[in-house]
UniProtKB/Swiss-Prot annotation:
Keywords attached to this entry: Glycoprotein, Glycosyltransferase, Golgi apparatus, Membrane, Metal-binding, Signal-anchor, Transferase, Transmembrane, Transmembrane helix
Positions annotated with a glycan in the UniProt record: 84, 215, 348
PANTHER family in the cross-refs: ALPHA-1,3-MANNOSYL-GLYCOPROTEIN 4-BETA-N-ACETYLGLUCOSAMINYLTRANSFERASE C, N-ACETYLGLUCOSAMINYLTRANSFERASE VI
The protein, known as: Alpha-1,3-mannosyl-glycoprotein 4-beta-N-acetylglucosaminyltransferase C
Amino acid sequence: MFKFHQVKHIFEILDKMRCLRKRFTVSFLGVLVIFLLFMNLYIEDSYVLEGDKQLVRETSIHQLNPERYVHTFKYLSNFSGTINVTYRYLAVMPFQRKRFLTIGLSSVRRKKGNYLLETIKSIFEQSSYEELKEISVVVHLADFNSSWREVMVQDITQKFAHHIIAGRLMVIHAPEEYYPVLNGLKRNYNDPEDRVRFRSKQNVDYAFLLNFCANISDYYVMLEDDVRCSKNFLTAIKKVITSLQGTYWVTLEFSKLGYIGKLYHSHDLPRLAHFLLMFYQEMPCDWLLTHFRGLLAQKNVIRFKPSLFQHMGYYSSYKGTENKLKDDDFEEELIDLPDNPPASLYTNMSVFENYDASKAYSSVDGYFWGKPPSTGDVFVVVFENPVIIKKIKVSTGTEDRQNDILHHGALDVGGYIRYFKQNRQCITYIRLGEFKNGNFEVSDVNQKIPFDVHCMRIHVTKTQKEWLIIRSISIWTS
C-alpha cells in the first residue's frame, strides 16, 4: 500500500533540489508521473474512494503549497499562445488530453464575501460522471496579494484535490510584471480613477486567462467567480453547438448578464486575448466582447434560453458594493431540452424586419414574426440529414402578443428529398395533426410514420388577419 510517509519523502527530496531549477523541473515532472500512477490505484478518474480522500488532500496540499512549490515551469507545453506571458502554476496536474470545453474563471480578493469555492463546487456538482471527462476548469487567481493567493490555493486544494489530480482543475497566476500600466489611465465615461483601474486590470486578467486556455479544449466558456450552474449544463451546450453545425458564429450566450456564459471557439481565444489587451483601458470587458463579436462579422446576439448560469454574489468585487443582479431566464433543473438537429429553414410568408425564420428554431432568444399569412403558406424545416423524431412541439404567439398565433394550421413531416432551384424539398408529406390554440405537440412520431424524416412543415390552412409569431420549434430525436 502506498503510504503517506513515502509521498512526504519524495517531496523532501524535491525540496533539496530547488536550487537546480532546470533539473528540478525534469525531476518534478517525473515524480508527478510516478505520483499519478500510484494514485490511480485509489482514484477512478474523478471519484476518490472515501477512505483515501484525506490522504489525497494532504498530499496535494503538501505538493502544491505556494510558498514551497510555486515555480514558473518554462519547460512545460506552451499554453500561452502568442502573448509572451510566463504563468505560475499554483495547483496543477498536466492535462492528459484535449477536452471539449474549458471553463475559465478569474478571481480577485473581495472586500466582502467570497464565492469562488461555491462556483467551482457548482461546476463539478452539476456535471455528470461522463460530463466531467469532457471539461477542464482553469482558475486565474489574479490578485497581486500573495498572501490571499496562498490562502485560496490551500482552500481549493483541500476541497477539490481529486479534481486537480484527475487533471480537470488548474489554478494559475499571471505575475504583476506582465501587466501594462494601471495607474493614471484616461477616464472614459467620467468613471472615477479607481474604477478605471479596476475595470482595466480586469480586462488584462481575462486576456491572460484566455491566452492560457487557447489549446486546452475545443470550446471555452467565460464565467465570473460568483456563479451557479444549471444541472448538466455541458449537455445543453453540446446540443446547441450541434444544432448550429454549418452556421457561422463567434459568440454564443448562455446568460444575459455581463460576460457570464459567453462561449467561444478556442481557436478565437488568442486574438480575443490580444483584443482585450489592446483596448484594456477603453471600456468594461462586456462592452469589448460585444465589439469583438461585431468585428468578426457576427451581427446579431445569439443567446439561448433558459439561461445556464446565474449570478449568485451579493457583494461586487469592486469596492464590495451590493450587486443584486439576477437572470430571470435561469433554470437550475433543465427539463427535457430539445435536440433540434442541424437544418435549413424556409418560408413564403412575408417576414417583418429581421424576425427571420431561423429565430424560431431551437432555443435562440428571438422568434419568427410574419405579416398575416394566407391559406397555403408554409414554414419548412429541412434537416441536413434524415432524422428519427420522437417528439415535436411548436409554440406561436407571445405573452405580449397573444393574438399573433397560428389560428388555423397543421403540421406535416416528409421524406424523399429532391432538389429544386438549389433548394432541397420533400415531395411527399404525412399530416401529424392540427394546431390547437396556436400550439402543436405530438409524441412517439417514430411510431406513427414509416420513414426517417427529411422535412417538417407548418401549413396554414386558413387565411387570418392577425400577424403570426412562431415563438419556438422544438424537436427531440431518437
